Amino acid sequence: MNTRIFFHISPERRGIILYTSVTVTGIRGLPLIQKGDDLPRLIIEKCALEDGDIICIASTIISKAKGYTRNLNDVIPDDRATRIAEKTGEDPRFIQVVLDQACDVLIETPFTLTEVSCGHVGVRSGVDASNVEDGLVITLPADPMKEAEEIRTEIKDLTGKTCGIIVTDTCGRSFRRGQTGHAIGWSGMSAIRDFRGDSDLFGHTLEITEEAVVDEIAGFANLIMGESNNGVPAVHFRGIPAWTGHNDIYFKEGEDVIRKALKKV
């Protein structure tokens, strides 16, 4: 699936970088990923890269290549996992894997909402039983930032091109139905484009505007990747101008009003 997007932005508008066009291409033809596969090499065989390109990669294929899976037949659920599973109607072994991956459990039912070690908060610790062999579940990479950096470095070594890498995961959203792609790891860019201190169209100083660019790119990548059996686990972006900002995409515990409210439930 190849989509060309045209942005037309007046150059008088705050002097921001003028977008001309962004090309978004699903990287097709990748094999079913197995443990030990050289993912960066497989990607560059299907995709000609240039400096400044961005590649979004589904966390599931990184986990499969690295062997971040669990066999449920080897999992013995404890009392907590069994208790939660009785309420949610899920396999207690699956819930045990969810708890094993979590560093904090925000809610247990009607679904488990957890935080994992990288700071990401999501349903069931991101543990996934889809697109994997029967009896296995896929877990998120423990350090997706490190995974993104390693992929970026290997692609640079193989091609000489300096690209950005975003590791994506499909997540639900508070207050809205449906799932979208979120960035859980990135390299070669900052997560947030910080507009604080800039002026709006009427000259007012912006005080709180911070754009989660990596999530916006991940969300579009997820549209191209699709779900179910679409089979496009990586997406290539060309033409996105560089931006400046910071990486503090996750609220600190004291800042997160939703976490505070959930802890009171």
Where are these regions (language model features)?
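Short, Lys/Arg-enriched N-terminal segments with co-localized hydrophobic residues
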Residues: 6-17
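N-terminal and secondary-structure boundary signal
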Residues: 17-265
